[in-house]
Each structure stands twice: as structure tokens, then as C-alpha cells.
A protein has these predicted regions:
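Short glycine- and acidic-rich boundary segments immediately preceding or forming the N-terminal edge
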Residues: 4-6, 10-20, 24-90
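Short beta-strand element of the alpha/beta-hydrolase
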Residues: 102-108
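Histidine-centered divalent metal-coordination motifs
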Residues: 109-111, 234
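Di-metal (Zn2+ and/or Mg2+/Mn2+) metal-binding site signature of metallo-dependent hydrolases
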Residues: 111-119
Length: 239
């Protein structure tokens, strides 16, 4: 399928109120009596996430329940934080899973401080899930495209309200490659200290678990296809 058709499908998906639910109006109120139950297709994390510490995650899990069998939900990794809680990193697939079909990936929450990026992806996912109840045109469109969502790549950083992950690593600087040309001091990535912004992690160590999760989703869901595109949502210049 060519670029034009993919663009047309994406435009159509976004046309009927794609962002009709503002990020600030996501329903983050949990079910009465406790935390939201994870969908049957998702592997539950080993430790219950404390209530009211990560409303974006609770909002996401409520949407996953509403989506039911229309969604292919997977916990790619889990991230443990200082409190002992464990947060899941979710990957959600919607539409035709055939590797011959183009795909669009939506990613958010790479930097924990930049909550708006995650909320935008969650709001769009919520819009799609709500429309699946009545929009026959959307169902027809999803026969020709695969949508992949990873709304909260860095739940530990979001829980701690930090740009970096719980290990102090900036996931946008965490890669096993070295620039050939000069990069801006510190901002281009540094290995001096996790106490400074833009820390890349120790030289020679594996990528952080969040980076591994992101790469796995891209490698399995996007790269094998004849055409794919990814949208990574950030917000502001959180340090």
C-alpha cells in the first residue's frame, strides 16, 4: 500500500473528533472499591500499583477494559520503583495484525515530567475505543491499517515526576551508539552522573528496560511491515 493511501486512512481516523477528548479531561476516577482490573489479555505486574499515584495509568487501564476484545494488549516489561511498586509498560494493538498491512505507532511518556504527551496518546486511544462501539467506517478502515499504542513508556519516571527513568537515565539518550560529530555539551548526552540531566547510563551496559520495551515493540510491530510511521508525543522542555 502506498504512502497516499496510508495518509488518507490516517486523516480519516483523525477526522471524526480524533482529539475530541482533551488531555485534561481524561477520566482518572477508578472503579469504586479499588484499583482498575487489568484486561484478561494483559499479564498483571507482580506488585499492585499504589492507588492514586499514577492517574494516567489508571485512566489507560480503564480504557483497556472498555476496549475488550477489540484490543490486543500486552505488558512488554515491568518497572520497579523505590517504593517497591511495579508498573507495567503496555503495548496496545488495534486493527489488522497482518504484516502486509501498514502500521502507525503512537508513543508517549518517554520523559516522566512531560505528562501531556502521554495524555494526548491516551486521549486518542480513548477516542478510538469509544468509536469502535458504533463507527462501522472505522472498523472498515482498521481492516487496512494497524494502530499500535505505547502511551506510557516511562511509568517510573512519571511516578517520580522526573524526566529520567528510576535509574536516572534519560531514555532519549539511552542507545548503544556514539555520535560521529560533536554534539552539544551535556544536552547531547553525558555519562558523568545520573544527577545531571541527559544521562545516558554507564558505558557498555544494556539499554534500560524501558528502552528495551520500546525497541521490542518497534521491531515486532512496525519494522517488518512494507510501510510504517511512528509519532512520539512530548511536551515542553522538562528537565
Amino acid at each position: 500500500m502506498g504512502h497516499c493511501k496510508v495518509t488518507a486512512v490516517c486523516d480519516s481516523l483523525a477526522s471524526v473528533g480524533a482529539f475530541a477528548t482533551p488531555a485534561g479531561s481524561i477520566n482518572t476516577q477508578g472503579q469504586a472499591g479499588g484499583m482498575l482490573r487489568r484486561p484478561p489479555s494483559a499479564t498483571p505486574p507482580s506488585t499492585t500499583v499504589p492507588e492514586n499515584v499514577l492517574p494516567e495509568l489508571r485512566a489507560l487501564e480503564k480504557i483497556l477494559e472498555q476496549g475488550g476484545a477489540n484490543l490486543q494488549v500486552r505488558v512488554v516489561r515491568e518497572v520497579r520503583v523505590a517504593s517497591g511498586a511495579s508498573f507495567p509498560i503496555y503495548s496496545i494493538g488495534i486493527g489488522n495484525p497482518s504484516p502486509d498491512i501498514p502500521a502507525v505507532g503512537f508513543f508517549g511518556g518517554v520523559h516522566g515530567l512531560e505528562r501531556i504527551g502521554a495524555e494526548v496518546v491516551i486521549a486518542y486511544l480513548q477516542n478510538i475505543v469509544m468509536r469502535l462501539r458504533w463507527d462501522t467506517t472505522l472498523h472498515q478502515q482498521l481492516e487496512h491499517v494497524r494502530l499500535v499504542f505505547m502511551p506510557i513508556v516511562n511509568p517510573g519516571g512519571m511516578w517520580a515526576a522526573t524526566r529520567a527513568n528510576p535509574n536516572g537515565v534519560d531514555l532519549m539518550r539511552n542507545a548503544p551508539v556514539e555520535a560521529l560529530d560533536r554534539v552539544p555539551f551535556l544536552m547531547g548526552g553525558q555519562r558523568l552522573s545520573a544527577g545531571l540531566p541527559w544521562y545516558r547510563g554507564h558505558f557498555g551496559e544494556p539499554m534500560e528496560v524501558e528502552s528495551q520495551a520500546l525497541c521490542e515493540v518497534v521491531r515486532t510491530e512496525l519494522l517488518p511491515r512494507p510501510f510504517s510511521i511512528a509519532l512520539d508525543c512530548h511536551s515542553g522542555f522538562g528537565v
